[in-house]
């Protein structure tokens, strides 16, 4: 991955977190952005948010215009990528893996 793309994703992550915290919706402004992945042409960004509620995606879709406007004003960029919000389930996967490893460890202890 090139340094420019990494820097863009890092800046976008910070700006999106600020944008969400500035919204008047308590569900949205308490969300955490865990990761941002930009497309090759940097015209599209996949934004991973930490939430268990699938309804939050429709709220984020409705607020996308405000969020993009905030990013443009705060960054001074000429253009903001189109945003696609995705629920980040990596924590859930990690917890499942931990449970599996604990079961394996218990099985070895019993032997």
From Swiss-Prot:
GO CC aspect terms:
cytoplasm
> What does the UniProt entry say about where the protein is found?
Cytoplasm
Grouped into one coarse class, the protein's main location is cytoplasm
Q: What does this protein do?
A: One of several proteins that assist in the late maturation steps of the functional core of the 30S ribosomal subunit. Associates with free 30S ribosomal subunits (but not with 30S subunits that are part of 70S ribosomes or polysomes). Required for efficient processing of 16S rRNA. May interact with the 5'-terminal helix region of 16S rRNA.
**What protein family does this chain belong to?**
Belongs to the RbfA family.
| Keyword Cytoplasm attributed | yes
**What span is annotated as the signal peptide, if there is one?**
none
Q: Which keywords describe this protein according to UniProt?
A: Cytoplasm, Ribosome biogenesis
Q: How does it assemble?
A: Monomer. Binds 30S ribosomal subunits, but not 50S ribosomal subunits or 70S ribosomes.
Which GO terms of type biological process are on file?
maturation of SSU-rRNA
Q: By what name is this protein known? A: Ribosome-binding factor A
């Amino acid at each position: 991955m090139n340094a420019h793309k990494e820097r863009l994703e890092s800046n976008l992550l910070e700006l999106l977190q600020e944008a969400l915290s500035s919204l008047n919706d308590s569900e949205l402004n308490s969300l955490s952005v865990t990761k941002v992945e930009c497309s090759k042409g940097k015209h599209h960004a996949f934004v991973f948010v930490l939430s268990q509620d699938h309804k939050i995606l429709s709220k984020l879709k409705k607020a996308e215009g405000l969020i993009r406007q905030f990013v443009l004003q705060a960054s001074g960029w000429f253009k903001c990528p189109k945003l696609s919000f995705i629920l980040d389930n990596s924590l859930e996967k990690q917890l499942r893996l931990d449970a599996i490893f604990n079961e394996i460890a218990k099985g070895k202890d019993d032997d």
